[in-house]
Design a protein with these regions (language model features):
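N-terminal interaction/assembly modules
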Residues: 1-152
Length: 152
């Protein structure tokens, strides 16, 4: 799990950032352990949530955002994957992406294309930062997400 939070921004948006981090971690548990999502949420609550809250110096996540992210993930996964396939360069195939890379791109697509609650540039910056923390290669994430925006 992530423990490098140096480039996570100030407290006023930490609840949203924490919710996105929690979603990434819960989805990883869900896929890695091949367990139902509700079990992964319970595992996360028991073992990881407290650490995240302490690291970001907050008392609670933005539970509405976390619920929106998780509830819409499985519902729209095929649409997310189609958008990913259509926006990868010719040299890349979706199967080449790791679990966290793929989930971060899926979540960012949800917020950019379906949720549309926050400013698009803010969403891109947030997910590029998260991609960098979890996977490295922020330039890949930035280029990919800008391609997604241009394809609208």
């Amino acid at each position: 799990m992530i423990d490098n939070f140096e480039n996570i921004r100030h407290k006023s948006i930490r609840k949203k950032t924490a919710s996105r981090i929690a979603a990434i971690q819960i989805l990883y548990l869900h896929q890695f352990n091949d367990q139902p999502l509700f079990e992964s949420i319970s595992t996360y609550e028991l073992h990881y949530k407290k650490f995240l809250l302490q690291k970001l110096d907050i008392k609670e996540l933005d539970t509405n955002l976390l619920s929106d992210l998780l509830e819409n993930f499985d519902k729209n996964i095929d649409a997310f994957d189609t958008i990913i396939k259509n926006n990868l360069s010719k040299d890349w195939k979706i199967g080449r992406l790791g679990k966290n890379e793929l989930n971060i791109l899926r979540l960012s697509i949800f917020e950019l294309k379906f949720f549309k609650k926050f400013d698009k540039k803010t969403i891109i910056n947030e997910y590029v930062s998260l991609f960098n923390n979890f996977c490295g290669e922020p330039d890949f994430a930035n280029g990919f997400l800008n391609n997604v925006l241009k394809s609208e």
